[in-house]
């Protein structure tokens, strides 16, 4: 007999029992319980009568589980005993599962053949005539063996026999599930989703009926998930039923037939007649409550279906579970069920599912990786799309793939379209219109904005939008409406009805448009141009979005929009033009425009070419009017009904003289007149705009005054920036939150400013005439940001008598303030800037105790303010992250400076009196000491080091010509050790990425690369052969260095980097390329230095980088596949990415970094490269032995152009130790 595993067996359960004892009681009940759970159990009645032992043994061999019911007379039957021997043979050879049940017999009696199990063997020749002694011995051994298998015991007096039968049946079902192949191999991601779903089902709760709704868009896998759960769990219930595809089946055969099927299945009664369906649940309540049920209602789309089929929870036994799959989450909310929103596949799962279908593998073929990514981007984790497209593209060439992907940009795949369209067909007419409008025109827009636009004739569509969300056709993300790309493509196809109409046949559309039963939405530029130039509009056209970016200039008739009486959305724009750019007029209306539809709710026309809007246009339905960069001189010359208007944007309409006609815009919320340079005044009726929230008058340079008191109480944002003719600030609403007055010529703020209780941002930057601030400034309790930079006549800052606990940003650069007030209660200040003051300003106020001062200060800018000393207690600024002291007269830093443990960015540029630097904070990432021309000495170490070092850092000492040799050696040595500690720490964390920025970078004035760089060359490029086993497990990175010659270089961009392009070449001439940065500077936008950086001499730039990328290519083996490396260096301004020609790399060098070896560590200690001071206090948290344990010098071939470089000593194995 061939052995086989239980999982490959054909049948479920074989029952071995003594019929005389248990056929009509225990075994009969057990077989029924198994059958109820869909388990095929075999009883050998027929085979006994035919005495067909061979067929019986064949059935035993092909069963997954054998259940043996030992009863009083079991051992009296030779047939049973032969079954038992065969079962145990299969257990040994096929790993068949065996479950013994000791039915009212003692387990030890079976094992030792005592009592009723001893009787048959006392006179075997009488009990078993013709049976050999050898076979009888095998029976005894089988009884003894079987009795030692874990099983069930039914005692003589048992009141819970029925419960035990159910327990055995459930356990058998579980065992069969464990034995069977999962069937989920192709169902990627199913296990994690099953796990999440089971948490909601609360299996342990046996007192409550739980209803769970699996919700998701069509094709996302709801039915598949429910089916997997049903197959796995149904055996644990007394009854179960899976009603598939209720949406379709209820229409075909009716709900009554589905209810009949449900009841007959869960009650296990094929002949059941439910009678009148109205009260069927009540009639069968007793029977329903007698069983724990598992019911799945699949693809439900109507609440009536749930109520009809499920009834009420009170009619079911506690512990029952009802699972509903639906596209409409609102249905689950209505019946108070729990929702499980089925997520799309993540990137890894999507790649696997697609690859299984397209390549019969878990990963794509290498040559199809790019095309595969395009498919994944299209499908966005949708299982149905991934399977359909994978099957379609399987075994196709790349040309077919490219053609298919190109078609998918505008056309759905047929099989996908058919499934998706079912969701659309279920919508009401109003829901369809809203869905198509969103898909064609308003995807990714703010939900409140879209709702306002789509409201038609006073009908609120917010409920419709919610319905579409509930039906999984759209989603809300950050309050914006989104949808799956495939749904949008389907919607556009439905809207165009390309195959039915032939939209490009404009004449047909004009003649037969009245036969169309749908609204037309147009966005194809060619179609729209044909329509407009020939004046063939129809009242079926609902929306036009015309992108002019690819159009040539064209003339339009004055009647271009004639006949489009139901046009609601009109947008003419240039997708290549940013919001602020001046429009190129491509649509010319030489004879003006005689008609615009009165149904317009949305009118956007970037660069509207006319001086006015058609006189006959009635804007009663207009909600959004955007005509930026237009030629308008006025909107309309008389008052019109604009009660629906909410948004108006006429920005950069340089000919606009007045904006009358908005007096009746009682719902207007936003008015943007930015850049309307001809606008001299606003109408007084602006005070009638009771809902106005936002008013932008930026750069209205002719605007001299505002209406007396803009008292509209709703105004939150007022922008007057750049209104250079505005001399007086009027009274405005006290509810304003953002007030921008920068660039105006106002001389003062009104005393009533204190009443602006909600003001959060006040910008007075470059108000050159402003001389004083209100003494009650501190009463602005909500003020978060105050900008006074450039107020050159402002001499006094008022006292802050009470804590302004909301104020976080205070900028006072380039003012005439000579003294700071004694009282400055700013407990929450985070950013303070006082750059460019001419006097000696005291900054002691910033270093108060945490309870009074600025313990939360993170950014402090004090450049060019004549500071000569910092307070000794500066270390108390525990939150400080950025500090700018450039251009001051500081000679040294206080000892407490290294207590600034959160300091990351430190700017000391142009501190020309600074002579030395102490130990700096441990977490410092960026230090810029450019042109500290008196700087001679540096602390050693410059920052504390730790064995687990992780802080990347860049130290710039350009133009520090007095930096002595010890300081340079200390800087280089510190950078070396820090970088190796970091690289080693990364290796220990099993980091396998590649960081394009340096672990440590430094720059200082010098003409030579340090001698321990064993690979050096003149010029900007370097090529070296790599020694065998160079990339062993201890390799951690590269050290790179260059000398850059500057020829009167001036860095106006404040960005500069030395870059390297590296190539590691394989034996087969293939190579791996990567780019990274050695060192440089990139001044943050918060840097307020006015001086540009000038360099005229040679400087050394050095960078250390972890380079695990080369390991990724060939793994961790000691056999390195790279045999040659080359490096090319260049400099760039980091803004334009162009190389700087006035800077030249004249020398370059490279060394390899490794985890240390013992002999290297000892030698490094002896050479004493860097004297690591251990007397820097508690912040210097490392021991020299610890450092040496983690540091090993660079090694490699000691090569130099023209011979060995002095200072490099060659070791036997061609590895060197740096001295």
Swiss-Prot record:
Reproduce the free-text note on domains from the UniProt record.
The TIR domain mediates NAD(+) hydrolase (NADase) activity. Self-association of TIR domains is required for NADase activity.
> GO terms for biological process?
defense response to bacterium; plant-type hypersensitive response; signal transduction
Q: Which GO terms describe its molecular function?
A: ADP binding; ATP binding; NAD+ nucleosidase activity, cyclic ADP-ribose generating
Q: What is this protein called?
A: Disease resistance-like protein DSC1
Role description: TIR-NB-LRR receptor-like protein involved in plant defense. Acts as a trigger of hypersensitive response (HR). Functions as a guard of CAMTA3, a negative regulator of immunity, during pathogen infection.
Domain (NB-ARC) ranges: 197-446
**Is GTP-binding a UniProt keyword of this protein?**
no
Q: What is its EC number?
A: 3.2.2.6
Against InterPro entries, the record matches this protein to: Apaf_helical (IPR042197), C-JID (IPR045344), Disease_R_plants (IPR044974), Leu-rich_rpt (IPR001611), Leu-rich_rpt_3 (IPR011713), LRR_dom_sf (IPR032675), NB-ARC (IPR002182), P-loop_NTPase (IPR027417)
Binding, ATP: 216-222
Q: Where is the active site?
A: 83
């Amino acid at each position: 007999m061939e052995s086989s595993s239980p999982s490959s067996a054909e049948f479920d359960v074989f029952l071995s029992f003594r019929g005389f004892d248990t056929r009509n009681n225990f075994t009969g009940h057990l077989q029924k319980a198994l059958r109820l759970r869909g388990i095929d159990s075999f009883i050998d009645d027929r085979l006994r009568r035919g005495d067909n032992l061979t067929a019986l043994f064949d059935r035993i061999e092909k069963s997954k589980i054998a259940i043996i019911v030992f009863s009083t007379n079991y051992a009296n039957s030779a047939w049973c005993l032969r079954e038992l021997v065969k079962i145990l043979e299969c257990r040994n050879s096929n790993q068949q599962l065996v479950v013994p049940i000791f039915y009212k017999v003692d387990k030890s009696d079976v094992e030792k053949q005592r009592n009723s199990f001893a009787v048959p063997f006392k006179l075997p020749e009488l009990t078993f005539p013709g049976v050999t002694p050898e076979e009888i011995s095998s029976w005894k051994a089988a009884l003894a063996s079987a009795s030692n298998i874990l099983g069930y015991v039914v005692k003589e007096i048992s009141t819970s026999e029925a419960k035990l039968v159910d327990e055995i049946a459930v356990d058998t079902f579980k065992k069969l599930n464990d034995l069977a192949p999962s069937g989920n191999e192709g169902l990627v991601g199913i296990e994690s989703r099953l796990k999440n779903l089971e948490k909601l089902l609360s299996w342990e709760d046996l007192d409550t009926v739980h209803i769970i709704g699996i919700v998701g868009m069509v094709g996302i896998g709801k039915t598949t998930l429910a089916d997997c759960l049903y197959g796995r769990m149904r055996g644990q219930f007394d009854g179960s039923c899976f009603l598939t595809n209720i949406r379709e089946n209820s229409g075909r055969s009716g709900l009554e037939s589905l209810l009949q099927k449900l009841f007959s299945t869960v009650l296990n009664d094929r002949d059941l007649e439910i009678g009148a369906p109205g009260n069927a649940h009540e009639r069968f309540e007793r029977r329903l409550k007698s069983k724990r049920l598992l019911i799945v209602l699949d693809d439900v789309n109507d609440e009536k279906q749930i109520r009809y089929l499920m009834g009420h929870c009170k009619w079911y036994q506690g512990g029952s579970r009802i699972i509903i799959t639906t596209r409409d989450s609102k249905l689950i909310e209505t019946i108070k069920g729990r929702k499980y929103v089925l997520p799309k596949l993540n990137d890894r799962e999507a790649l696997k599912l697609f690859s299984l279908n397209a390549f019969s593998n878990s990963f794509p073929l290498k040559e199809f990786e790019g095309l595969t990514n395009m498919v994944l981007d299209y499908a966005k984790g949708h299982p149905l799309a991934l399977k359909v497209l994978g099957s379609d593209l399987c075994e196709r060439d790349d040309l077919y793939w490219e053609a298919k992907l190109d078609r998918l940009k505008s056309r759905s795949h047929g099989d996908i379209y058919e499934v998706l369209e079912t969701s659309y067909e279920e919508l009401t007419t109003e829901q369809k219109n809203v869905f198509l409008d969103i898909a064609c025109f308003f995807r990714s827009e703010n939900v409140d904005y879209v709702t306002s636009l789509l409201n038609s004739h006073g009908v609120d569509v917010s409920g419709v939008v919610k319905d579409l969300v509930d039906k999984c056709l759209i989603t809300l993300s950050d309050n914006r409406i989104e949808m799956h790309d495939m749904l949008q493509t389907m919607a556009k196809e439905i809207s165009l009805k390309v195959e039915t109409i032939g939209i490009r046949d404009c004449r047909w559309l004009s003649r037969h448009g009245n036969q169309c039963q749908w609204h037309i939405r147009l966005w194809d530029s060619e179609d729209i141009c044909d329509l407009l130039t020939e004046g063939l509009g129809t009242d079926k056209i609902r929306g036009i979005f015309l992108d002019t970016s690819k159009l040539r200039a064209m003339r339009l008739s004055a009647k271009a929009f004639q006949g489009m009486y139901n046009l609601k959305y009109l947008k003419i724009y240039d997708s290549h033009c940013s919001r602020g750019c001046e429009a190129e007029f491509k649509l010319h209306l030489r004879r003006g425009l005689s008609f615009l539809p009165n149904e317009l709710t949305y009118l956007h026309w970037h660069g509207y070419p006319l001086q006015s809007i058609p006189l006959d246009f009635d804007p009663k339905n207009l909600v959004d009017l955007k005509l930026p960069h237009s030629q308008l001189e006025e909107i309309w010359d008389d008052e019109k009904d604009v009660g629906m208007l909410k948004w108006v944007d006429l920005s950069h309409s340089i000919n606009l003289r007045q904006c009358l006609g908005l007096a009746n815009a009682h719902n207007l919320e936003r008015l943007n007149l930015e850049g309307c340079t001809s606008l001299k005044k606003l109408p007084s009726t602006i005070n009638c705009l009771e809902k106005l929230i936002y008013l932008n008058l930026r750069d209205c340079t002719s605007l001299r005054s505002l209406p007396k008191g803009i008292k509209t109480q709703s105004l939150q944002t007022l922008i007057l920036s750049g209104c250079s003719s505005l001399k007086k600030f009027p009274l405005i609403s006290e509810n304003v939150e953002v007030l921008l007055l920068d660039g105006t010529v106002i001389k003062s703020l009104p005393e009533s400013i204190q009443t602006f209780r909600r003001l959060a941002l006040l910008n007075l930057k470059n108000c050159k005439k402003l001389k004083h601030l209100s003494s009650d400034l501190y009463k602005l309790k909500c003020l978060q940001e105050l900008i006074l930079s450039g107020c050159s006549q402002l001499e006094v800052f008022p006292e802050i008598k009470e804590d302004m606990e909301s104020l976080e940003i205070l900028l006072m650069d380039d003012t005439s303030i000579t003294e700071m007030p004694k009282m400055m209660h700013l407990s929450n200040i985070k950013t303070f800037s006082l750059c460019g003051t001419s006097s000696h300003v005291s900054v002691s106020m910033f270093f108060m105790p945490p309870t009074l001062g600025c313990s939360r200060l993170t950014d402090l800018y004090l450049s060019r303010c004549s500071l000569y000393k910092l307070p000794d207690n500066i270390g108390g600024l525990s939150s400080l992250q950025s500090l700018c002291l450039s251009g001051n007269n500081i000679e040294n830093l206080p000892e407490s400076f290294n207590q600034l443990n959160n300091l990351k960015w430190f700017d000391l540029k142009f501190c020309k009196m600074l002579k030395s630097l102490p130990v700096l904070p441990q977490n410092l990432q960026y230090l810029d000491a450019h042109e500290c021309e008196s700087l001679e000495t540096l602390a050693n170490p410059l920052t504390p080091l730790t064995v687990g070092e992780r802080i990347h850092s860049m130290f710039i000492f350009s133009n520090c010509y007095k930096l002595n040799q010890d300081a340079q050696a200390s800087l280089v040595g510190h950078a070396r050790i820090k970088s190796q500690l970091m690289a080693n720490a990364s290796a220990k964390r099993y980091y396998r990425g590649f960081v394009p920025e340096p672990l440590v970078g430094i720059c200082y004035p010098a003409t030579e690369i340090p001698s321990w760089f064993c690979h050096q060359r003149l010029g900007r490029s370097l090529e070296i052969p790599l020694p065998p086993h160079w990339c062993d497990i201890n390799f951690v990175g590269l050290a790179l260095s260059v000398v850059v010659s500057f020829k009167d270089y001036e860095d106006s961009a404040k960005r500069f980097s030395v870059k390297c392009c590296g190539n590691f070449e394989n034996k087969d001439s293939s190579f791996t390329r990567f780019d990274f940065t050695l060192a440089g500077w990139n001044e943050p936008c918060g840097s307020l230095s006015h001086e540009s950086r000038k360099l005229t001499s040679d400087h050394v730039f050095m960078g250390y980088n972890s380079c695990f990328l080369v390991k990724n290519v060939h793994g961790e083996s000691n056999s390195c596949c790279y045999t040659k490396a080359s490096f090319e260096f260049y400099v760039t301004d980091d803004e334009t990415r162009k190389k700087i020609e006035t800077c030249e790399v004249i020398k370059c060098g490279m060394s390899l970094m490794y985890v240390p070896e013992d002999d290297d560590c000892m030698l490094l200690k002896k050479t004493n490269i860097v004297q690591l001071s251990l007397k820097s206090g508690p912040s210097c948290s490392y021991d020299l032995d610890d450092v040496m344990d983690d540091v090993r010098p660079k090694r490699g071939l000691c090569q130099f152009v023209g011979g060995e470089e002095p200072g490099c000593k060659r070791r036997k194995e061609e590895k060197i130790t740096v001295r």
